[in-house]
């Protein structure tokens, strides 16, 4: 059963030259996400897509509870599809709400990235 849906759209240009903004990257992304971003040579579409996915997940959990961006990790599944791993407050919130799964989809063009997250009970 669907608990909630979140969506986010971001401009890719906001994430150009992000390699120079190391502090921002370290504040928003987990070490696993940063490793993937480095493998992709700091591709702004990749960074924008991951950022949009984190925002979409946060919106799908829209309860007013604030948590750190690093509490939401976007991973690549075996088939290459994005998967969500939660930590700390985000993980605890899902447990409290009875959320069993969060699915996420990411897409991007040259100028925008979009992500949709569905929280399921």
From Swiss-Prot:
Swiss-Prot/TrEMBL catalytic activity: apo-[ACP] + CoA = holo-[ACP] + adenosine 3',5'-bisphosphate + H(+)
Pfam families membership: ACPS
MF (Gene Ontology): holo-[acyl-carrier-protein] synthase activity; magnesium ion binding
Organism domain of life: Bacteria
Transferase is among the record's keywords: yes
Keywords: Cytoplasm, Fatty acid biosynthesis, Fatty acid metabolism, Lipid biosynthesis, Lipid metabolism, Magnesium, Metal-binding, Transferase
Chain sites annotated for binding Mg(2+): 8, 55
InterPro entries: 4-PPantetheinyl_Trfase_dom, 4-PPantetheinyl_Trfase_dom_sf, ACPS, Ppantetheine-prot_Trfase_dom
Top enzyme category: transferase
GO annotations of cellular component type: cytoplasm
Subcellular location(s) of the protein: Cytoplasm
Family recorded in the similarity comment: Belongs to the P-Pant transferase superfamily. AcpS family.
The name this protein goes by in its record: Holo-[acyl-carrier-protein] synthase
Gene: acpS
């Amino acid at each position: 059963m669907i608990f909630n849906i979140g969506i986010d759209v971001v401009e890719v240009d906001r994430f150009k030259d992000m390699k120079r903004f190391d502090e921002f990257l370290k504040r928003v992304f987990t070490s696993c996400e940063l490793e993937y971003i480095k493998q992709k040579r700091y591709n702004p579409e990749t960074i924008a897509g991951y950022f949009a996915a984190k925002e979409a997940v946060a919106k799908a959990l829209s309860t007013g509870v604030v948590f750190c961006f690093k509490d939401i990790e976007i991973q690549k599944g075996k088939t290459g599809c994005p998967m969500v791993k939660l930590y700390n407050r985000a993980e605890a919130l899902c447990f409290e709400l009875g959320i069993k799964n969060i699915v996420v989809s990411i897409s991007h063009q040259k100028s925008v990235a979009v992500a949709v997250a569905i929280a399921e009970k």
